[in-house]
Amino acid sequence: VIGAPLFIISGPELVIAQCKAGVIGSFPALNARPQHVLEEWIVRIKTELAEYQEQNPDAKVAPFAVNQICHGSNDRLMDDMATCVKHEVPIIITSLRPPAELVEAAHSYGGLVFHDVINVRHAKKAAEQGVDGLILVCAGAGGHAGVLSPFALVREVKEWFDGTIILSGSIGDGYSVASSIALGADFAYLGTRFIATKEANADPEYKKMLEDSAANDIVYSSLFTGVHGNYLKPSIVNAGMDPENLPEADKSTMNFGSGGNTKSKAWKDIWGCGQGIGRIEDSPPVADLVSRLSEEFNDAKDAFLSLIHISEPTRPSLI
């Protein structure tokens, strides 16, 4: 499992808890403001994880990742990447433009680059730049999301891409994680489920809204950032807008500058959310959630093996 980078919400506390629990934790570089805070966060994460590993030598501590937004309005991009190179961040997650220069920078110290895409055309462009993995953001993902079914996108990409496949979209429990792996993904990418955790830097009302809502409370719109994404309907209503009559926006409204997009309240007041929300009923500590995910994953695996009347490690025949 990879914990997706969550704008505003992902900070050192959440990332450290995820990695200690064996989940790859991540955060957007732009969450660390001003720019020099990014180095402080990276040093803190590396230090605390190293200390935890030393104190718990048998623990499976996962690496962490930093998300870079590759857009012309992000005036911090190269400075942020220089900081990541300096401290040899294990994984760089890139969004929007295929990042040739970032791939080269990460590979200079042995780092990996995973790029998020919503269709095959974008996936091929990213693969041409030498990324190590593709994050397939399918229908139902929280925040910026695509519209393709994972059954279509995962299987088509695997026909030609030999790198790491990460699946995103409506993955809210261990059963969904197991389904992702069965489909051919190497990792499941969970964002919304980690918003509703003790360590997440989210408004308590946001967490409560996640616990109280379901899939039919999700609205897909481009209004708030210029790119289509999934958002919580009640948060749109609370902001004084009609979720059933939202105008469309275009990509020219996107702004990832160091000062932020002062005109848009996306992420702060308009809350992103995936369609897997129906399984969220509480906001536990990350460690407890990951333990639950593991139990559900194993339950799903056992149910499948029982269904086809075999026991591990025999491989089933579908003929």
Segments (PLM) and residue ranges:
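Active-site entrance/lid segments in N-terminal catalytic domains of soluble metabolic enzymes
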Residues: 1-164
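Short, flexible helix/strand-to-coil boundary loops that buttress conserved ligand/catalytic motifs
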Residues: 127, 199, 314
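Positively charged, low-complexity/disordered segments
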Residues: 312-319
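Conserved protein kinase catalytic core
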Residues: 73, 197, 318
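Conserved active-site-proximal phosphate/metal-binding subdomains
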Residues: 147-166, 172-307, 311
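Small-residue (primarily alanine) positions within well-ordered alpha-helices
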Residues: 123-126, 180, 185, 319
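Tryptophan-centered motif/residue detector
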Residues: 7-8, 41, 267, 271, ...
